[in-house]
Amino acid sequence: MQKLMAMGALCAALATAAQAETLALDGIGNSRDVRCKGQDVAITGNANRFRLSGDCGRVEVHGSDQVVTVDNVANLEVTGGENQIEAERVGSLDVSGADHRITAQVQGDGEQPASVVLYGGSNILTLDLHGPVHLEVNGIGQQVTWRGDDPTVETSGGEHRIQRRQPCAGWRFDWNVIRCA
């Protein structure tokens, strides 16, 4: 009986470990729809198009010319250059590299402020801020526009443009989501 219980515990532990593994999406010019199911996701390569649906843990986007849309992600990290990311909801956002275009709704977990950290140069972030958010902008020539709650802002480097977006003039339909134009 003890051997049977030990075997059951081992199987449960292996199933949990398999579920906790990071899902790796890589290549050049690939296109794919993926359900996160709470998993962490690592995206690498060049010119891929990935749609991540559901709740994701940590999502890392490395490389260049990636186009990624994601529903809900706890932590989003973007490195490399010229990636385009659209996230319906992120808990924290960490960006480094250059010439990224990122659109996201940033919302903390209610216990701590959400965090947005930006390094590199010439990145463009368009953010909807909900609840307390700490925004740290470093590097050169970063552009951050937001609407919603005012963030606490910390800067270093230069030639940044950090400003509140004006109210909606109209609406647009993009990636099956209605957005302010």
Language model features with spans:
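Extended beta-solenoid/beta-helix repeat architectures
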Residues: 18-181
